[in-house]
Amino acid sequence: LTYDILTKLKNVCSDDIVGLRNKLLLQLGYETMRRRSEICQFRFEDLQHHGNHKHALLLRHSKTDQYNQGKIIPISNELSEMISSWSLAIDQDSGSILRSFKRNLSTNPSLTPASINHILKRLQKQAGLNQIGELSGHSFRVGAAIDLLDKNIPLEKIMLRGGWKSETSAMRYLQSWNDSNWLVVN
């Protein structure tokens, strides 16, 4: 789920409350490069505002942080504003940021990791992006890592951003891109 695909998916999101949540999900997943379970655990209380218009989210726990030391993840002004707008739209300022909906469009306490895959598949179909393979929660990590690689960001920085502790893990995400790197021999 590269930036180009992210843009296409956001463009098919409706303007209602569900579409607002879906746009937020897409931006949150792409920018943070987190696993589905980690995306679902972000809370409104985790949003931090620092000097010079810098914003971050606290990731309280991850697969590679078994001691719950947490990690500060810088985010864009756009994402910070999206979280604030979402908070106002659902009239909540605590608890899980991403939420599912009941039939009457009131919110449930939290979106589930499995729901992320369902939402991505639905948006992918609406955007007519069936030729790229099935999107899943891992697509955020892969696409953002590929975008960083395309910008010539060093592997070490990509690893830090994505939370990979070993080059082997990071390279698995980037391998498919490297295998088809559009190399042309003249």
PLM segments and residue spans:
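Basic, alpha-helical nucleic-acid-contacting "clamp/cap" segments
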Residues: 50-107, 119-126
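N-terminal core-binding DNA-recognition domain of tyrosine site-specific recombinases/integrases
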Residues: 15-20, 110-112, 134-135
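Mobile genetic element proteins and their domesticated derivatives, centered on retroelements
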Residues: 9, 25, 33, 39, ...
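Basic, Lys/Arg- and aromatic-enriched nucleic-acid-binding interface segment
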Residues: 3-36
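Short, basic (Lys/Arg/His-rich) helix/loop patches that form interaction surfaces
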Residues: 92, 117-160, 167, 179
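Catalytic-site neighborhood detector that most strongly recognizes the C-terminal catalytic loop/helix
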Residues: 162-186
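Short, charged phosphate-coordinating catalytic segments
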Residues: 29-53, 156-160
